[in-house]
Amino acid sequence: MCQSRYLLFLATLVLLNHLTSARVIPVSGPAKCLNQSQNLLKTTDDMVRTAREKLKHYSCTAGDIDHEDITRDKTSTLEACLPLELHKNESCLATKETSSIIRGSCLPPQKTSLMMTLCLGSIYEDLKMYQSEFQAINAALQSHNHQQITLDRNMLMAIDELMRSLNHSGETLHQKAPMGEADPYRVKMKLCILLHAFSTRVMTINRVMNYLSSS
């Protein structure tokens, strides 16, 4: 009887140790970045849906707005993040200077390459530009007496979290100057344009993170 209890006690200890070890297994960097990009995709889609509903009189649909890419001629995400077999101007892209040196956890050692480093650096710069624009627009929206719409805090947090994973350099982000007394109609139209452009870019980011986290 005593021996049976002792064996049961040992088995319980082994099980508890196994469960404890399972809890503390850290999520790999690429997997964490994928989770963050998926969260960003969800919160961005939610924000686009909210904008379409609340700004239905502003023609805030993808087919009605004038599409504008604020990252054009400033980053090379679309070129650098192409599959390696499709790269035609790798040497040209490689000579471009990037203002971000990736020190984050999204790039696994087995997939490290010059082009992927450029890709993640460009993604970081994209997020930084959109973050700055969204902060300025949100401040303008909140300053209006009738707060018809403001940016979803969850989306802004998702941008910040992925940026921190992409770059651990401790860079201080500079906020864009407030828009001041901007016309409410123009502010909301700019919000629609930015949201649709950002949604498209987030899809690209999510595909990259899917690739990096795959075995």
From Swiss-Prot:
It is found in: Secreted. Residues 1-22 form the signal peptide. Its main location: secreted. GO terms for biological process: cell migration; cell population proliferation; cellular response to lipopolysaccharide; defense response to Gram-positive bacterium; defense response to protozoan; extrinsic apoptotic signaling pathway; immune response; interleukin-12-mediated signaling pathway. This is Interleukin-12 subunit alpha. It comes from the Eukaryota. Heterodimerizes with IL12B to form the IL-12 cytokine or with EBI3/IL27B to form the IL-35 cytokine. IL-12 is primarily produced by professional antigen-presenting cells (APCs) such as B-cells and dendritic cells (DCs) as well as macrophages and granulocytes and regulates T-cell and natural killer-cell responses, induces the production of interferon-gamma (IFN-gamma), favors the differentiation of T-helper 1 (Th1) cells and is an important link between innate resistance and adaptive immunity. Belongs to the IL-6 superfamily. GO terms for molecular function: cytokine activity; growth factor activity; interleukin-12 beta subunit binding; interleukin-12 receptor binding; interleukin-27 binding; protein heterodimerization activity. Keywords: Cytokine, Disulfide bond, Glycoprotein, Growth factor, Secreted, Signal. Disulfide bonds join C33-C106, C60-C192, C81-C119. Glycans are attached at N35, N89, N167. One of its GO terms (cellular component) is cytoplasm. It comes from Rattus norvegicus. Heterodimer with IL12B; disulfide-linked. This heterodimer is known as interleukin IL-12. Heterodimer with EBI3/IL27B; not disulfide-linked. This heterodimer is known as interleukin IL-35. Interacts with NBR1; this interaction promotes IL-12 secretion. The keyword Disulfide bond applies.
